[in-house]
């Protein structure tokens, strides 16, 4: 298993319940054994440097996880089909 740093940005026009639902869905991918979430931060609503899909703000979320390749592939699949996510990045740690 490898360590990954993940950042994703949600559309700013979502209500808090829906933001929590999306966060829970994405985090559940890494809560199945043997994967684990090492750290997580809901950074909140921040200004974007440039417009993304006509949005100037977005809800930022950050995760540090230890996961196998299947979990990362599943995370990528979910993120790509979720329209509320406007950007994401997954970076493999140097460990």
Swiss-Prot record:
Gene3D superfamilies documented for this protein: 3.30.70.60
One Pfam family here: Ribosomal_S6
- Coiled-coil regions in this chain? none
Q: Which GO terms describe its molecular function?
A: rRNA binding; structural constituent of ribosome
Keyword list (alphabetical) reads: Ribonucleoprotein, Ribosomal protein, RNA-binding, rRNA-binding
Which GO BP terms, alphabetically? translation
Quote the cellular component terms of the Gene Ontology held in the record.
ribonucleoprotein complex; ribosome
- Keyword Cell membrane in record: no
Has keyword Magnesium?
A: no
Entry similarity comment = Belongs to the bacterial ribosomal protein bS6 family.
Q: What does this protein do?
A: Binds together with bS18 to 16S ribosomal RNA.
What name does UniProt use for this protein?
Answer: Small ribosomal subunit protein bS6
Species of provenance: Aster yellows witches'-broom phytoplasma (strain AYWB)
Gene assigned in the entry? rpsF
